[in-house]
Amino acid sequence: MAPTAVYTQKDSPSSSQPSSKGPALAIGSLETAQDGKYQSLITELEATRQVDKLLLDRLVDGATTLEPSKYNSVHVTLASSDYQSLQESTLRSLLTQLLTGLTPLGTLHLLNLTDGLKTLPSELTLSGFLVLSAAGENPGDSIVAQKPAHAIGASVSLKKRGSATTTSTTAFVTTTTTTSTSTTTATVTSAPSVPLLLRKRGDPAKKKALWALTTDASASPSTKIDADALLTAEDKARPVPTCAPVDRSAPRRKKACKNCSCGLAELEEEEKRNAPVVVIDSSIDGEGGAKAVDKAERERLLEAAKNAPKATSSCGSCFLGDAFRCAGCPYLGLPAFKPGEKVEIDFGMDDF
């Protein structure tokens, strides 16, 4: 019986096999297409992966949009004038579009940078990228940025201890093929899932003890401090309102308070007694004039008005006020008064 040879089939490289690297996007401009930099970038990338080609103005003008999470890498080669125009207008919106088109952990390569783009790393960070390598000071340097593994705002479920594990498993298949029997044996191994555990809650009794009013272990938990027991008789006594003595040179208060004890009430009464008085009389200037009189004259006029006969009026309405007076009334402009009394207006009145 002839011996049987057993061969293990191995995958041999073939030119028809797709590359291990994911699809890439090459972005250029008219200037880089004319000087050959864009074509060189495409030739270099097509050797190892599938490459989609796009010009910058298509993205900036909104003529096309990128499919979400399609490209493993995006390579941008622009001229210095293109970078300057982007920095002044639509750089933030372009970076947002590129972030959308990249897969998680995909990389963005900005090539042929100039030394004037100092704010580009900060713009990448604000757009959601992680800057892996920054450009140097030499013209032609590049910046490499990466899209985070999780998008901003992505939710991750947290399961408590003892809950069911996830149902999704990863299968590893090992295949062995023999040429004599043409049989295939497959072994499937499921990768164990690791649940995410929440933080264990603390002891409620320990937390409650932190807010206890007493640290004495023998004391009752219901023991409370009586706030009234901490006050003395002096604390409970109603304070007597007092004010500082009045100072004639300092600015005074508007008015003395009730039951004033600082002397302001007496000062106001004294000023009222000694204040000058203006007497308005129709006998002055023939039209009802005004003159200032002292205290003695004021008292004399008051006494004279009290003893004088009642005043008379040709129309009988002079004493009722301006609404009842004629145009030539000598009392025009004066307040209403009783017949025979003098009208007095103090210097402190606002309507004089």
UniProtKB/Swiss-Prot annotation:
[4Fe-4S] cluster binds at residues 315, 318, 326, 329. InterPro entries: Anamorsin, CIAPIN1, Dre2_N. Keywords: 2Fe-2S, 4Fe-4S, Cytoplasm, Iron, Iron-sulfur, Metal-binding, Mitochondrion. A motif (Cx2C motif 2) lies at residues 326-329. GO terms for biological process: iron-sulfur cluster assembly. GO terms for molecular function: 2 iron, 2 sulfur cluster binding; 4 iron, 4 sulfur cluster binding; electron transfer activity; metal ion binding. It is found in: Cytoplasm; Mitochondrion intermembrane space. Residues 315-329 are annotated as: Fe-S binding site B. Its main location: cytoplasm. [2Fe-2S] cluster binds at residues 243, 257, 260, 262. Residues 1-11 have a biased composition (Polar residues). Transmembrane segments: none annotated. GO terms for cellular component: mitochondrial intermembrane space. A motif (Cx2C motif 1) lies at residues 315-318. Residues 196-237 are annotated as: Linker. Residues 1-24 are annotated as: Disordered. Its cofactor is [2Fe-2S] cluster; [4Fe-4S] cluster. Pfam families: CIAPIN1, DRE2_N. Residues 1-196 are annotated as: N-terminal SAM-like domain. Residues 243-262 are annotated as: Fe-S binding site A. Belongs to the anamorsin family. Component of the cytosolic iron-sulfur (Fe-S) protein assembly (CIA) machinery required for the maturation of extramitochondrial Fe-S proteins. Part of an electron transfer chain functioning in an early step of cytosolic Fe-S biogenesis, facilitating the de novo assembly of a [4Fe-4S] cluster on the scaffold complex CFD1-NBP35. Electrons are transferred to DRE2 from NADPH via the FAD- and FMN-containing protein TAH18. The C-terminal domain binds 2 Fe-S clusters but is otherwise mostly in an intrinsically disordered conformation. Monomer. Interacts with TAH18. Interacts with MIA40. This is Fe-S cluster assembly protein DRE2. It comes from Coprinopsis cinerea (strain Okayama-7 / 130 / ATCC MYA-4618 / FGSC 9003) (Inky cap fungus). The gene is DRE2.
